[in-house]
């Protein structure tokens, strides 16, 4: 990653993350997406970073969002698209904006198909298994580049 200052971050939440708080709490915890976004905003405020959060169940909407990003850094939880979306991978690579891949659950302790990511090899880093704290850790990493 270059030494450029990070002033703005976009957080992208992939499919089904709008169901957090009710969907498989054993894997994803009990926090809702709104609660996670509130924590992200609070962390960004402390770090004096502008942050935008975005969630979609649509691959096309996520692609369009990535294409339009003017931020310095991306934090993405591609969710189920982790294992299927070459197009999102290509969009992230094309933007040349550094990003961290985040997963709420430990994908390596789950089904074998979840262990393959189309994003990890081009990401600055991957955070998996720390619940909502993973987003905050990624934001702290971006903030230290300020």
PLM feature spans:
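Short, glycine-/small-residue-rich phosphate/pyrophosphate-handling segment
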Residues: 109-146
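Nucleotide and nucleotide-moiety/phosphate-recognizing core
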Residues: 40-68, 89, 95, 100
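Extreme N-terminal starter segment of soluble prokaryotic enzymes
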Residues: 5-9
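Short acidic/histidine-rich motifs immediately flanking catalytic phosphotransfer sites
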Residues: 68-74
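Mid-chain, well-packed structural core segment of small domains
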Residues: 74-108
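Mobile beta-alpha loop/short-helix "lid" or hinge segments that flank ligand
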Residues: 10-16, 104-118
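Glycine- and acidic-residue-enriched helix-capping/strand-helix junction motifs
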Residues: 20-34
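Short beta->alpha linker loops
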Residues: 57-58, 80, 130
